[in-house]
């Protein structure tokens, strides 16, 4: 597998660096467990709601992939990638899965693209339309929207958990009131989600995605047949362990999964982010080749 697109993808985000990493910093929230030096105790026991369920509420950011792991992945391309300086988007500040969900697969073992997926990629590439949806001020594809630099916020309430994404100021609603998934949902950017608790793990099922966004920075496509299963477990005050499974039989030969950890952004918050305000990037991006490997 080739990783040239990682370097070019970092360079692309250099044009959008004003949209990443904005946070309200250093506003000490009341009721947080703290160590003797006044910092939030990230290893304290996970909080719970009145009904005894773990409380996922808080501002979170995916754990970055280590420099050592990036060196292993990129090999002799690491130095070139490391020279690209984008605030909040350095090679040691993002998750490898934001660039490619298949990063852990050995060549030939990853789910194969169905003919429809290959045709879609070639069509968009030949038309010069192989680009991120955020370049047109549309929502970034999920899960890429939370696997790169932007922070997000869980707001947990009875019957519903809301995920607020700083990137584009969009949101997901996860209904936990026992309702079933709809039989014929209206396709949308973030789909229709229901959740239930299995012990201390929130299990989320999502269907009803549209086919307009990419799953990751390697331009892996999705279809309206995608079904995504997420499992969130807050192991302590400062960490959520998450697993995501993607099943899209129209695009891929088999389901695939990733596991990540989300880190609490203590005493912080998300900021307003209006893409269309002073937008200057789009006219420079049409037809840009990011080194995609269609395999």
Pin down the residues of each PLM region:
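Positively charged n-region of N-terminal signal peptides that target proteins for export
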Residues: 1-5
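Bacterial N-terminal signal peptides
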Residues: 7-16
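PEST-like low-complexity, intrinsically disordered acidic/proline/serine-rich tracts
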Residues: 19-295
């Amino acid at each position: 597998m080739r990783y040239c697109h990682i370097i070019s993808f970092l360079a692309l985000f250099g044009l959008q660096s004003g949209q990443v990493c904005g946070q309200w910093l250093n506003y000490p929230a009341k009721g947080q467990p703290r160590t003797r030096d006044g910092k939030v105790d990230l290893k304290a026991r996970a909080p719970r709601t009145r009904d005894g369920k773990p409380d996922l509420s808080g501002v979170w950011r995916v754990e970055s992939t280590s420099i050592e792991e990036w060196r292993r992945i990129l090999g002799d391309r690491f130095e070139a990638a490391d020279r690209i300086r984008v605030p909040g988007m350095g090679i040691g500040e993002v998750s490898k899965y934001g660039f490619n969900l298949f990063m852990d697969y050995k060549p030939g073992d990853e789910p194969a693209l169905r003919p429809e997926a290959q045709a879609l990629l070639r069509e968009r590439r030949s038309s010069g339309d192989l680009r991120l949806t955020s370049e047109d001020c549309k929502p970034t594809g999920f899960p890429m929207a939370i696997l790169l630099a932007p922070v997000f916020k869980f707001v947990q309430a009875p019957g519903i958990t809301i995920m607020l994404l700083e990137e584009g100021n969009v949101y997901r609603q996860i209904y936990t009131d026992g309702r079933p998934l709809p039989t014929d949902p209206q396709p949308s950017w973030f789909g229709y989600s229901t959740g239930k608790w299995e012990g201390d793990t929130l299990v989320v099922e999502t269907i009803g995605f549209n086919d307009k966004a990419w799953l990751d920075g390697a331009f892996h496509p999705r279809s309206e047949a995608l079904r995504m299963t997420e499992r969130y477990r807050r192991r302590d005050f400062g960490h959520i362990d998450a697993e995501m499974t993607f099943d899209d039989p129209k695009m891929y030969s088999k389901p695939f999964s990733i596991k990540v950890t989300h880190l609490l952004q203590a005493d912080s918050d998300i900021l307003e982010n209006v893409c269309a305000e002073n937008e200057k990037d789009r006219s420079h991006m049409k037809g840009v080749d990011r080194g995609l490997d269609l395999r």
